[in-house]
A protein has these predicted regions:
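N-terminal "arm"/small-domain region of PLP-dependent enzymes with the aminotransferase-like
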Residues: 1-27, 225-227, 354
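Phosphate-binding glycine-rich loop
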Residues: 28-74, 88-92, 98-99, 165
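PLP-dependent aminotransferase class I/II
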Residues: 35-39, 44-50, 111, 115, ...
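Structural detector of well-ordered beta-strand residues that form the stable sheet scaffold
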Residues: 51, 76, 97, 150-151, ...
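Conserved SAM-binding loop
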Residues: 52, 77, 98, 192, ...
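PLP-dependent aminotransferase-like
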Residues: 65-154, 161
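Short beta-strand-to-turn element immediately C-terminal to the catalytic PLP-Schiff-base lysine
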Residues: 176-177, 190-195, 244
Length: 377
């Protein structure tokens, strides 16, 4: 079976984990490897501050805390996303306002955002689906006009850009994931990027269980104490050590994944021309990171048959999000506003193909062969 995903591994990770435990004697949070990873993110993506977290979910939770939401405040987000995007803001007492996506990028529709803004709206959460950027100029203009915060859900967007700017660095906050399913992994982990300097100190406090420990470690106070709400969002330095090996090889991983993405896209171009499938769309002003490669089949039944055919042929393919507004918690904590033109339709038709670092040319060719065979090619 050709697996849908294989966690990335470049070969240096375990040596760095060993160094963390045996040489540095630092396996709790905020150790040397954590600092290396954070500096790398800040330097490579021109971020004001990057803080590693225990997950992409906890990065979103930190962003939600920084937004200072009150019960009943509204947060606008796409329904076509993972539950973490929603739960982070629900925990702050927010009401979720789900809106439709665009048919090309599968990202949140800026016009749909503008249409649902009320006096209770506080935050916009653009989700960069498949590592392809949302229309951030439009979204930021809307946010500025209505004095709203923007928290980018960029879990899939590490190494992607919008008009030359790294995803996660455009809004007030950006949230990355380094889960094993992502392009760069620490097993479980993430990062929050703070792009507005006014929030940097408080972000450190929230991450350090509500204490000003970071100020103490910098010698800015003679002792640290509890000053605000927060939680324990620091990952082990052993996890950061694992991630460091991959950040050192970030371009190699990127190039490898892009080779597979382009091989798929070239191989299926004729299927799209014949109307048998739809291919991913990447606008010219955006650079994506090959986080995933998906096809859209004509109907839900077609997709079900397609996934079954691939499985029988030794290829694991997966559908993706079920719209959050149709889930029990989605109905409880929010509602869909406007017309659902594309969200449910895309959810029912989209299927993702195997794509991971180190995928062999032979396996890539086999996936292409099986997909084309399904269509009699």
């Amino acid at each position: 079976m050709i697996n849908f995903n294989v966690p990335p591994y470049v070969g240096t990770e375990m040596e760095y984990v060993r160094q963390s435990a045996e040489d540095n004697h630092k396996i709790c949070g905020d150790g040397p490897f954590t600092k290396r990873c954070q500096s790398w993110l800040e330097e490579h993506f021109d971020a004001e501050k990057a803080l590693l977290t225990t997950s992409g979910t906890s990065a979103l939770e930190m962003a939600a805390m920084l937004c200072d939401l009150e019960p009943g405040d509204e947060v606008i987000l796409p329904s076509f996303t993972f539950s973490s995007t929603a739960t982070a803001f629900v925990q702050m007492g927010a009401r979720l306002v789900f809106v439709d996506i665009l048919p090309d990028t599968k990202n949140i529709d800026p016009a749909a955002i503008e249409a649902v803004i009320t006096e209770k709206t506080r935050v916009i959460v653009p989700v960069h689906y498949a590592g392809v950027a949302c229309d951030m100029d439009e979204i930021m203009a809307i946010a500025q006009a209505h004095d709203l915060l923007v928290a980018e859900a960029a879990a899939q967007g590490v190494m992607s850009t919008y008009k030359g700017k790294a995803l996660g660095t455009i809004g007030d906050f950006g949230c990355y994931s380094f889960h094993e399913t992502k392009n760069y992994s620490m097993g479980e982990g993430g990062a929050v990027l703070i792009n507005n300097p006014a929030y940097c100190e408080r972000a450190e406090i929230i991450r350090e269980k509500g204490t000003n420990r970071s100020n103490f470690l910098r010698g800015q106070v003679d002792k640290y104490t509890w000053v605000d709400k927060g939680s324990s969002y620091l990952p082990s330095d052993m996890n950061a050590a694992y991630l460091w090996g991959q950040l050192e090889a970030a371009q190699t991983i990127y190039d490898d994944r892009m080779a597979t993405w382009h091989a798929y896209n070239d191989a299926f171009a004729d299927l799209a021309e014949e109307g048998l499938v739809e291919l991913p769309v990447v606008p010219d002003d955006r650079v994506q990171n090959a986080h995933m490669y998906y096809l859209l089949l004509p109907t839900l039944e077609d997709r079900t048959n397609f996934i079954s055919f691939l499985k029988e042929s030794g290829v694991q393919a997966c559908f993706h999000y079920v719209p959050l507004h149709s889930a029990p918690a989605g109905e409880r904590f929010g509602s869909f506003h406007g017309e659902d033109v594309y969200t449910t339709e895309v959810s029912e038709r989209l299927v993702r193909l195997p794509l991971y670092y180190g995928m062999s040319v032979a396996d890539r060719a086999r996936v292409i062969e099986v997909v084309r065979a399904y269509f009699g090619r």
